[in-house]
């Protein structure tokens, strides 16, 4: 789509993002940048692109990898892919709820390793119920609400905490109850994170909150890794303050080969695949391309982060 209207330089290599030097070289004197959340787009990258840069189109919903304030100051539009990935990410969040509580990965490994010797056993891989439990959601926005809809099919009680405004629609439609953060962590059987990453939410889940969680509860994160203090989470898992965790995101991606998380049996770890379905990723690519082309053609982007920008 883009190559029909623009000269395109591809910086990424399949299987890995571009290095910093590769990125700085690729953006030189460009009118537009189409990036992913693995690409840190800061003032130095904008300097390398030069005065022609008009738009930074992110192939993602989150834009915490882009210096929005700097782009706006320079008159550069920043676009994102909106709510396209909502349902796919909600599916994965609920998959992690089921996988952690019912020991699905442990069961798969038991069978494939040929260590399952004696058929049905009344004590084999006993997990935790999901139906009828309490789901706590941090950030009852688009994705959090989609997870809540799925939870109602399991007769779960829904409590939530938003850092700012309440979600009155979800309260009325699904009986979701807004509580403070302390009550949320204390009462949740499953705590699922769906808020954006910013200075207020960075390390929102740390030792003080983890210690207040039930020792048979689980934490699920499909949002951003930096919402959780990973060192504190590892401590909580080792000392059994909580029963387990399902993580699609990490503080550093990929996690260090020496991370204790990789050795734990009470975690399910995924490589940041919340939106990874053929249909969702295709739609994201189309929107990212349209956003970029719309700006270059002096049209309105579909999803714009900084509408207040004074264009170059």
Predicted regions: what they are:
Residues 1-79, 206:
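An N-terminal-biased, well-structured beta-alpha scaffold segment characteristic
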Residues 9, 159, 226:
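Conserved beta-strand positions in the Rossmann-like core of class I SAM-dependent methyltransferases
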Residues 11-12, 59-60, 75-87, 162, ...:
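Short beta->alpha connector loops at strand-helix junctions that form conserved
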Residues 41-45, 163-260:
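Rossmann-like adenosine-cofactor binding region
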Residues 53, 131-134, 207, 216:
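Phosphate-coordination loops involved in phosphoryl transfer and adenosine-cofactor binding
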Residues 72, 79-91, 106-107, 119-126, ...:
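C-terminal helix-to-coil terminal segments
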Residues 82-134, 146-149, 163, 168:
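Phosphate-binding beta-alpha-beta segment of Rossmann-like dinucleotide-binding domains, i.e.
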Residues 140-141:
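Glycine-rich Rossmann-fold phosphate-binding loop(s) that bind the pyrophosphate
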């Amino acid at each position: 789509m883009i190559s029909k209207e623009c000269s395109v330089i591809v910086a990424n290599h399949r299987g890995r993002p571009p290095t910093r030097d590769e990125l700085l070289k690729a953006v030189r004197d460009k009118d537009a940048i189409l990036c992913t959340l693995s690409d840190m787009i800061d003032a130095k990258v904008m300097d390398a692109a030069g005065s022609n840069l008009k738009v930074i189109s992110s192939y993602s919903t989150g834009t915490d990898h882009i210096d929005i304030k700097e782009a706006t100051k320079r008159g550069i539009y920043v676009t994102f892919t909106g709510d396209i990935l909502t349902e796919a990410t909600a599916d994965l969040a609920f998959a992690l709820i089921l996988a952690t509580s019912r020991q699905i990965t442990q069961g798969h490994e038991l069978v494939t390793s040929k260590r399952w010797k004696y058929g049905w056993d009344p004590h084999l891989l006993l997990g935790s119920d999901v139906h009828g439990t309490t789901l706590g959601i941090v950030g009852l926005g688009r994705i959090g609400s989609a997870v809540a809809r799925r939870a109602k099919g399991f007769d779960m009680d829904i409590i939530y905490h938003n850092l700012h405004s309440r979600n009155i629609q979800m309260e009325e439609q699904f009986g979701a109850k807004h509580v403070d953060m302390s009550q949320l962590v204390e009462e949740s059987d499953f705590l699922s994170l769906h808020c954006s990453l910013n200075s207020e939410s960075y390390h929102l889940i740390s030792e003080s909150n983890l210690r207040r969680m039930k020792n048979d509860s689980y934490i699920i994160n499909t949002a951003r890794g930096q919402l959780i203090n990973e060192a504190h989470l590892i401590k909580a898992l080792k000392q059994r303050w909580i029963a387990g965790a399902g993580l699609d995101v990490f503080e550093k991606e990929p996690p260090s080969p020496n991370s204790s998380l990789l050795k734990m049996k009470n975690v399910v770890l995924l490589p940041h695949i919340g939106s990874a379905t053929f249909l969702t990723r295709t739609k994201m690519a189309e929107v990212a391309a349209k956003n970029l082309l719309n700006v270059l053609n002096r049209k309105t982007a579909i999803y714009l982060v900084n509408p207040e920008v004074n264009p170059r």
